[in-house]
Amino acid sequence: MNALSGVATLNTAASSRVVQLSDTHLMCEPGGQLLGVDTDRSLAAVCRLVAAHGPIDALLLTGDLAGDEAEDAYGRLGEALVSLGAPSFWLPGNHDAIWSDDHPLKWHFKRTVRLPHWDILMLNTQHPGAVAGYLADSEIEALEQAVEHAQTTGRPLLVATHHPLMPVGCEWLDEIGAENAQAALQRLVPLSERAV
């Protein structure tokens, strides 16, 4: 089963406000902690901060949504995000479960988010049984198709992953980046302007 599928088309204004969140690590029970932090309270504080900056058009949640693959955590996550009034699109991280295609929250896991003037490609770097990331052949193929679409249409492309594709200057995070990131980065070379 593929974790990501489909296209979500958002008809927003000429400019789009997209917020990216990662590593919410919600636990099975409300009030669960990770490294001494109540992750539900942390998410609530982040949502208040996002709301204070005005309306947004979309949320990208880029992995480690749950801290222990607990299904209840995903339901609470969806409920917490409702207050922001924007659709949210999710990527799995190394701490997340992947569901069957008929799971009620599966609609959050889209391959592509299409905004009026640019596209967002969601790539799954989850490598079951490992902490470090890895891009399966299907993810590399999706990237190739998205790059070809960007070249054909001239639409800018943003690529979202959980595991970094390049070193970010944080030793422990750099150690768990996508193992085959170079394969992805090579596919991005044809795009003349890019930021990674």
Pin down the residues of each PLM region:
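N-terminal active-site segment of His-dependent metallophosphoesterases
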Residues: 1-76
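Alpha-helical scaffolding within the catalytic cores
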Residues: 2-7, 44-46, 101-111, 143
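Active-site-proximal beta-strand elements of phosphoester/diester hydrolases
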Residues: 15-28, 117-127, 158-162
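Divalent metal-coordination and catalytic microenvironments
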Residues: 23, 59, 64, 77, ...
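Metal-dependent catalytic neighborhoods of phosphoester/phosphodiester hydrolases
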Residues: 30, 61-82, 97-109, 133, ...
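Active-site-proximal segments of metal-dependent phosphoesterases and phosphodiesterases across multiple
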Residues: 32, 154-196
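Short, electropositive alpha-helical surface patch
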Residues: 71-87, 175-188
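A short, structured active-site edge motif that brings together acidic residues
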Residues: 88-99
